[in-house]
Amino acid sequence: ANLVPADIKGVSNVLKALTKGEATGILPDQFPPEISGQTSTFFNVRTRTMTLIHKLIGRVKCNTLIASAIRVVDGWEIYFQRVDDDINSTDISASLNALNRSIEDIVKLNPSQYQWEYKRFKDLKDNGKKFYD
């Protein structure tokens, strides 16, 4: 594995790898900075979603899978699933909604093991209070 930083140089390395037909992995459910995300639906809640994957697919036209590792008594169960076909849409909203639906499908396999500390809803406010207060 070749880990790269989550900055412009890292994105450049990912793009180069994809253009060479190499496999890459991105954690798609991180809460992105405002400049790197757009509002989309995640578990029926409107929240910010990273746009990087949509942009990479638009440039490279690569295949996409979603993966997860679920801890079991004697190790791990690894799952690979197809991503909703709309992830390939040129419409960014359709693509991001497809990404989030695919993440939801993986989370539903075992919600207790999802990394909820990613705080996907931290930009939400309810009656002036932040979602995680």
Where are these regions (language model features)?
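Membrane-interfacial amphipathic helices and adjacent loop/beta segments
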Residues: A1-I8
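Non-catalytic C-terminal accessory region of glycerolipid acyltransferases
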Residues: I8-D133
